[in-house]
Amino acid sequence: MSKKYDAGVKEYRDTYWTPDYVPLDTDLLACFKCTGQEGVPKEEVAAAVAAESSTGTWSTVWSELLTDLDFYKGRCYRIEDVPGDKESFYAFIAYPLDLFEEGSITNVLTSLVGNVFGFKALRHLRLEDIRFPMAFIKSCYGPPNGIQVERDRMNKYGRPLLGCTIKPKLGLSGKNYGRVVYECLRGGLDFTKDDENINSQPFQRWQNRFEFVAEAIKLSEQETGERKGHYLNVTANTPEEMYERAEFAKELGMPIIMHDFITGGFTANTGLSKWCRKNGMLLHIHRAMHAVIDRHPKHGIHFRVLAKCLRLSGGDQLHTGTVVGKLEGDRQTTLGYIDQLRESFVPEDRSRGNFFDQDWGSMPGVFAVASGGIHVWHMPALVTIFGDDSVLQFGGGTHGHPWGSAAGAAANRVALEACVKARNAGRHLEKESRDILMEAGKHSPELAIALETWKEIKFEFDTVDKLDVQN
């Protein structure tokens, strides 16, 4: 060997802690929140994360001389304190782009959140954010359609889209399921939806559900003169079965299908997204299992990272929480990852949890989906928070109407249109919410009953995962 090789073990910071390094535009940047074991220096912990998520191993190996380790290694170039947390710190790591397969979110996550999360030197580790370089973004497929194409396909403009999940989500026969879909769509919704765990169970095989849903959609379209859709969940136990279900939805003339992207996996999701673009189908994405990964404030992967990865992997709509409903998520954090789904450029903004500038180039945007414990009284806040390029989904807030699902759908549609009209007239939706809704309720008995039914329903629990900002 032409170079001297010294066997043994050396500290990670001797190789992977490089505070003088200036990241390149082509580097993939990551921010980790690290909590090390007692007595381990911050620099050693951060360097260990950089090493174990890139080229490193626990000992010096002779085969390092066969490559250019200095070119390929991950580098921790900055450490920051976490406001209000004396145990943890932020480690900023730069990875050369050649460490990752082009267009493969699976490969990126395998490196960044792989074995390193079981490292003994760490008590906790959380991936807070990723800056994807433009060279990597251009190699990804992205959303199969995007916001503008979806609006054109559905012929719906100037307002958020309106939907609901069919309830009860499990136990209905295919025919009864289709009946509930019809009631919701004729009442005024744009979409109805399979819940994440409805696939092909003994009480309702997928072919049966697809056929009755297609019948309900076509009948509601004839009655209302509007384009309607239902998120047919094609998530299955094998990719082959998933594509069979997607093909059948296409044969039935359905505009949109659905995938559980975390339980289904990024590889399956990217493949399905490519299929959707080739076959002219919209793709709705459910985030089932996300809270297992993202809810702990010190360990796991923040949802903003999952949202970024989904935009790259492919999807036209993604659940994001509601801020005001029953699910976790504060306002500023939610706005931060909504920006990552929809905007072409998102600047660094710690007040929204964005640690890096993120340039998305010409990649299409993704509709943010608000779903979970919302009802008509939430409509003004939802329209304010989520804006027009969103889908507002009321499950219990539709089916729980005393007069049934059609009346619940009508109430939500009237409330939405009243809020959009008030906003366009320059009114402050959140400050004037009661006046706006009560006035609309005078002309809609369905809305009036809904307002009375849901007036005491609130979900006032504190957020577990809060932004790390200085008070």
Swiss-Prot record:
Binds 1 Mg(2+) ion per subunit. It catalyses: 2 (2R)-3-phosphoglycerate + 2 H(+) = D-ribulose 1,5-bisphosphate + CO2 + H2O; D-ribulose 1,5-bisphosphate + O2 = 2-phosphoglycolate + (2R)-3-phosphoglycerate + 2 H(+). The record marks K326 as: Transition state stabilizer. It comes from the Bacteria. The keyword Manganese does not apply. One of its GO terms (cellular component) is carboxysome. Its cofactor is Mg(2+). The active site is at K167 (proton acceptor), H286 (proton acceptor). InterPro entries: RuBisCO, RuBisCo_large_chain_AS, RuBisCO_lsu_C, RuBisCO_lsu_C_sf, RuBisCO_lsu_fd_N, RuBisCO_lsu_N_sf, RuBisCO_lsuI. The keyword Nucleus does not apply. One of its GO terms (biological process) is reductive pentose-phosphate cycle. Its main location: other. Induction: Transcribed during light cycle, reaching a peak after 6 hours of illumination, mRNA becomes undetectable during the dark. Part of the csoS1-ccbL-ccbS operon. GO terms for molecular function: magnesium ion binding; monooxygenase activity; ribulose-bisphosphate carboxylase activity. SUPFAM superfamilies: RuBisCo, C-terminal domain, RuBisCO, large subunit, small (N-terminal) domain. Its EC number is 4.1.1.39. It is found in: Carboxysome. Substrate binds at N115, T165, K169, R287, H319, S371. The modification N6-carboxylysine is found at K193. Keywords: Bacterial microcompartment, Calvin cycle, Carbon dioxide fixation, Carboxysome, Lyase, Magnesium, Metal-binding, Monooxygenase, Oxidoreductase, Photorespiration, Photosynthesis. Mg(2+) binds at K193, D195, E196. The basic functional RuBisCO is composed of a large chain homodimer in a 'head-to-tail' conformation. In form I RuBisCO this homodimer is arranged in a barrel-like tetramer with the small subunits forming a tetrameric 'cap' on each end of the 'barrel'. Heterohexadecamer of 8 large chains and 8 small chains. Belongs to the RuBisCO large chain family. Type I subfamily. RuBisCO catalyzes two reactions: the carboxylation of D-ribulose 1,5-bisphosphate, the primary event in carbon dioxide fixation, as well as the oxidative fragmentation of the pentose substrate in the photorespiration process. Both reactions occur simultaneously and in competition at the same active site. This is Ribulose bisphosphate carboxylase large chain.
